[in-house]
Curated annotation (Swiss-Prot):
GO biological process: threonyl-tRNA aminoacylation
Compartments where found: Cytoplasm
Reactions listed under catalytic activity: tRNA(Thr) + L-threonine + ATP = L-threonyl-tRNA(Thr) + AMP + diphosphate + H(+)
UniProt keyword Ligase present: yes
PROSITE patterns linked to this entry: AA_TRNA_LIGASE_II, TGS
EC number(s) recorded for this UniProt protein: 6.1.1.3
Principal subcellular localisation of the protein: cytoplasm
Domain TGS: 41-104
Superkingdom to which the source organism belongs: Eukaryota
Matches recorded under Pfam families: HGTP_anticodon, TGS, tRNA-synt_2b
Keywords, ordered alphabetically: Aminoacyl-tRNA synthetase, ATP-binding, Cytoplasm, Ligase, Nucleotide-binding, Protein biosynthesis
Principal EC category: ligase
Protein name as catalogued: Probable threonine--tRNA ligase, cytoplasmic
Length: 458
């Protein structure tokens, strides 16, 4: 990505992108001219796998035209077709009598086409937004693709020269929002709180033995910071060595002792759950309660001396000896789906502004004000806030009532007076009687208030 060391090459982008567009338009115009000059005599189209026959015209009828004839649902879900067993764009005209099969995302052909096309779009977006350099690589949507020599990545490639420096850089912290699968019994599944496929804010810290206590305290502080923003109270549990553990007892004892020290220093009450740790190490679980007082384990910190040894991970210590690091598994939110379900009930649909999916709505008083209302919506949206618009001919009372029921945090009323002054009249979700409505505000002042609420998690 573009940064201070690798800035985006604006001159290159400004020259090559218009050239690409121009070339595309020239080829498109040439193809359209050729299509118009070719004969459009009737053809027979055999639909697979059913063998149903449809009529069409050469160089005119496309697979999408046939899909529309069959059903709107098929046309909407279609991604690619096969003409005489060769993949064919849905909008490309058919050239003669042929067999035709249409594929959606539920097929390998449809998925591979979607992933291939979306990868090109993603590449173009990354190039224009961050200045990434596009290169030719294998189209392997079902494979990992990590088959390049490390030298290909330049400074980013990991090689032997990096290993002596790793000790000096410990702890190394890595995090990702990863998709996980768990084979839950059907009877254990419940809404979004317990599912078989979920996203987790997975993080791993690699550190020296003497760094474990401070790193665990750092994760605990981070969890406390996030949960205080949400307004959660939580319980801390230390789970110790289970019967099916791996590793020696001395290592387990040290790991449990490190977590106990970190919890004591953290200063909040905690309890021990004997024998409930992971097979590879002890763990701290953080439990929160929803609006119905049901308890859910969300955040976790798991200490792992075993897996680094199993994978033979080593670093060169300051004693010039190869030693195994300690790995700390952690998650702050845990399952994103479960956390979202808890937040839904916790806030009862009345989201704070910084987290709200309906931060504001612009309500115009009349058709004459619609243009200014759209301008206000665009100005707020461009800064990054969620804002809708109500241009219907209903009464203002009805619009405001519906907006509060929705519920939008801010209701921005626009009439002739606001058009003339370049302002908006602000009504608040929390004040149905209108006693605490704000005075007219400029868009700049309103955005300042939005920013204040966002940065302060209000």
């Amino acid at each position: 990505m573009a940064n201070n060391h690798h800035p985006k090459d604006e001159a290159y982008l400004s020259s090559v992108i218009p050239k690409r567009i121009r070339l595309f338009e020239e080829i498109q115009a040439e193809q359209l001219e050729q299509l118009q000059s070719r004969p459009h005599d009737p053809i027979k189209i055999t639909l697979l796998p059913d063998g149903i026959e449809k009529e069409g015209r050469r160089w005119e009828t496309s697979p999408m035209d046939i899909a529309v004839q069959i059903s709107k649902g098929l046309a909407k879900s279609a991604l690619v077709s096969s003409v005489n067993h060769v993949l064919w764009d849905m909008n490309r005209p058919l050239e003669g009598d042929c067999s035709l099969e249409i594929f959606g995302f539920d097929s390998d052909q449809g998925r591979n086409t979607f992933w291939h096309s979306s990868a090109h779009i993603l590449g173009q977006a990354l190039e224009q937004e961050y200045g990434c350099k596009l290169c030719i690589g294998p189209c392997e949507p079902r494979d990992e693709g990590f088959y390049y020599d490390s030298l290909y990545y330049g400074e980013l490639g990991l090689n032997d020269n990096h290993f002596p420096n790793i000790e000096a850089k410990l702890p190394i912290r890595m995090a990702e929002f990863g998709v996980l699968h768990r084979n839950e019994d059907s009877g254990a599944l419940g809404g979004m709180t317990r599912v078989r496929r979920f996203v987790q804010d997975d993080a791993h810290i690699f550190c020296r033995v003497d760094q474990v206590e401070e790193e665990v305290k750092g994760v605990l502080d981070f969890i406390d910071y996030v949960y205080r923003i949400f307004g959660f109270t939580y319980e801390l549990t230390l789970s110790t060595r289970p019967k099916d553990h791996i590793g020696d007892l001395e290592t387990w004892a040290k790991a449990e002792n490190d977590l106990e020290k970190a919890l004591d220093d953290f200063g909040k009450p905690w309890v021990i759950k004997e024998g409930d740790g992971a097979f590879y190490g002890p763990k701290i679980d953080i439990t929160v309660s929803d609006a119905r007082n049901r308890k859910f384990q969300c955040a976790t910190i798991q200490l792992d001396f075993q897996l680094p040894a199993c994978f033979k991970l080593k670093y060169l210590s300051e004693k010039n000896e190869m030693e195994a690091p300690v790995m700390i598994h952690s998650a702050v939110l845990g399952s994103i789906e479960r956390m979202f379900a808890i937040l839904l009930e916790h806030y009862k649909g009345i989201w704070p502004f910084w987290l709200s999916p309906r931060q504001a709505i612009v309500c115009s008083l009349s058709e004459d004000c619609s243009s200014y209302a759209k301008q206000v919506q665009k100005q707020i949206n461009e800064v990054g806030y969620y804002v809708d618009i109500d241009e219907s001919d209903r009464s203002l009372r009805k619009k405001v009532a519906d907006a509060r029921d929705a519920p939008y945090n801010y209701i921005l009323v626009v009439g002739q007076k606001e058009v003339a002054t370049g302002q908006v009249t602000v009504r608040l979700r929390e004040d149905p009687e209108g006693r605490k409505d704000l005075p007219e505000m400029s868009i700049e002042s309103l955005l300042d208030e939005f920013k204040f609420k966002t940065v302060n998690f209000l």
